[in-house]
Amino acid sequence: MRAFVSALLALWSLSVFSPAAHAQSGQWLGGSAIQSSVQVGAPGEAWVGVWVDAPVVTTMRTRSPMAVSFVVDTSGSMAGPKMDNARLAAAAMIESLSDGDIVSIYGFATDVTEVSAPTVLDPVSRQMLLRNVGHLVAGGGTNLEGGLRAGISRMTSAPMSHAVRRVFLISDGQANVGVTDPRALGYLAAGATEVGTQITAIGVGYDYDPMTLNAVAVQSAGRMHHLGTPDQMAAILETELSWMSRSVALSAVLEVRPASGIVILGAATTGATVVDGVLRMPLGAITAGQRRELLFRVRVPTADIGRRTLATASLRFETPEGAHAAPQSAEVAMTVTREAPRATPAPRVAAMVAQYDASEAERAAAQLLQQGRQAEAIARLDAARASVASTATSYSFEDSAVQGALSSRAAELGAAAAGARAASSPAAMHERSYELQAAPMAADGY
């Protein structure tokens, strides 16, 4: 364990600072319709993309204090390597966090066990928490509801000074005690956002319920990780701690209000919902250099020639210190013209559509593999790879990162197709389906 902890401490020594306050200055928000113009009288439906590009910051200062709750499934199925690695991950986190951070630990089986109440880290309490990690013992059912409630409730008592808040939820099974409906558990997780908290859900193995853990991550504007084997917890922990330490915005929310006469038909991006005609997407914490995108369709009246505002996007968030930052806004417009438009589609929005189509193909392929329809799944993935690769080379991208993301996605789709081809048994196809379900979540920023 010492080697693992030492590795994480080395990572943390590079990440103990977070962006300075001036990181909140500048425009992060942008947007565009896929076409800048449409011919008068033409069908008036169009893709629209809105994006948040957080700045890459080089000026640093001491990071803000964190409040973390570690919530571990201690049901019987977690016995063995899964529980061993969960203890190791908890211990590594305790070693890696700084004095002054707040940590709590809970185990949930049939009942919820408070392993450690919220504790402010110092040299003495750190050793106590490390000893308490050994009290995580497997046995019983899976009271996911109870574990969520315990972790979230402790965030409500976190002081305002600890604005960076996270619940880490680890499970390998399906909820079978208390509330078990994925939508209800997602609604419970959504309550975490009211106290500035996100939930990182970590599914271990190939028997957990992806629908439930996805709902928990999305509704809390958190993160979702699929772990094929429990020893991958090390990489997950490294990623999460690094991201948390580099937060430039907290409790971020992206909203899109349509202009008069414009109708938002629906969102393609996971986590975005339309309520009373307004599109809303909680983003939670945003990391320096992170990009979040929102893709949706609108209906545009095309009877009259002229420029039309389609919608106004707004971004609201808090600083890592918990102060309200100045909101940002961006207008998206389109021109109705007499002649047929000749302009090529907006490259970034075309890329967003290609990424969305890839996610739909991955979801469909996952279902096909679950049904044993291997050849159809492979065909969907191959077609998606070709489409994404074509988009990457068909446009002149001003932003090389957008093109790079497309190239990476094409490579991932190719690898997924190869994995599906190599699946020689129903069990192997089941495992590949879990990996395919995780890919769209990662693509949408979860």
Residue ranges, per PLM feature:
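Hydrophobic residues positioned within well-ordered beta-strands of beta-sheet architectures
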Residues: 29, 46-48, 68, 252-254, ...
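Extracellular adhesion/glycan-binding regions together with long Ser/Thr-
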Residues: 268-290
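Long, acidic serine/threonine- and proline-rich intrinsically disordered regions
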Residues: 292, 300-446
